[in-house]
Amino acid sequence: MTVATSASTAVPSDSRQRVATFLKDLQDQICQGLEAADGGAQFQEDTWQRPEGGGGRSRVMKNGQLLEQGGVNFSEVWGEQLPPSILAQRPEAAGYGFYATGTSMVLHPRNPYVPTVHLNYRYFEAGPVWWFGGGADLTPYYPFAEDAKHFHQVHQAACDRHHREYYPVFKRWCDEYFYLKHRGETRGVGGIFFDYQDGSDRELYRGPNPDGEAARYSQRVGSIGSRSWEDLFAFIQSCGQAFLEAYLPIVERRRHLTYGDRERQFQLYRRGRYVEFNLVYDRGTIFGLQTNGRTESILMSLPPLVRWEYGYTPEPNSREAELYSTFLKPQDWVNWPV
């Protein structure tokens, strides 16, 4: 049985159950892979209920050999009142109750040579309106081009299994989304990011910046035709299941590199950018706070230790300076020579 929608596509009657089951399985898969990589610490699970409807399970690892702190969350919430952040983007959802489910993850490694990483995949329904969103992005503290290239190549391969224009559009969208306007720099080397993918016969880019590189590229591509709910569900499954392949080889290359106080202090300083982005710009944080989500779970993305320094500038010709000059601006990482 299927339910017709305004996007001239059809949603299976068991859509919510199927997506939630996949996202919980993804949480399990990622946690098991990270526990095996850490070799000692385990995730502690905290289940919670939302009074207005729904709940979730938060899993956090602290003080591991690999992770100083990391969290992998699953949530499934519903309610009658749509948050303003959703209505601003999809006003046609007004007047309907909503359902939202997602798995989100942020890992803050101990060694400054191991990059921080973020993942989120989600699904939303409100009456006739539905869409998938998500992505994954990498935030290194020290510049290793082969790591950025590997992370992008794995996600490009996952995208290409479904459409060859997914990666070029969603890579540009990621560069645009994870950008700190007040700092004039990207959060890291990016990855993929997409939202409002509902299968309608429209351009792939559906973000807020019609003049950006993502929009311009998407306009050149034009419509790729309508896609079914099943097509898009298969796509986010491929992306989610690509994460461990994209991240763990980087971890193994960097986790045993020797570092000192200089590298640690720079890591803590750069973590400040993560805090700034998540509290000022991040759509998931804003949505969670507007829908009375669980604050501890929403703010799980923040690092355990961080510092700010007035007027910091990296030493010329240093590895830190290379991060700023090359790794905090959009690059064609898939084709980067290494």
UniProtKB/Swiss-Prot annotation:
GO biological process: chlorophyll biosynthetic process; protoporphyrinogen IX biosynthetic process
GO MF, any single term: coproporphyrinogen oxidase activity
The UniProt record lists the keyword Cell membrane: no
PROSITE patterns (alphabetical): COPROGEN_OXIDASE
Important for dimerization, annotated site positions: H182
Gene3D superfamilies: Coproporphyrinogen III oxidase, aerobic (3.40.1500.10)
UniProt cross-references to NCBIfam families, sorted A to Z: PRK05330.1
Family per record: Belongs to the aerobic coproporphyrinogen-III oxidase family.
Purpose: Involved in the heme and chlorophyll biosynthesis. Catalyzes the aerobic oxidative decarboxylation of propionate groups of rings A and B of coproporphyrinogen-III to yield the vinyl groups in protoporphyrinogen-IX.
The name this protein goes by in its record: Oxygen-dependent coproporphyrinogen-III oxidase
Native species: Thermosynechococcus vestitus (strain NIES-2133 / IAM M-273 / BP-1)
Lineage: Bacteria, Bacillati, Cyanobacteriota, Cyanophyceae, Acaryochloridales
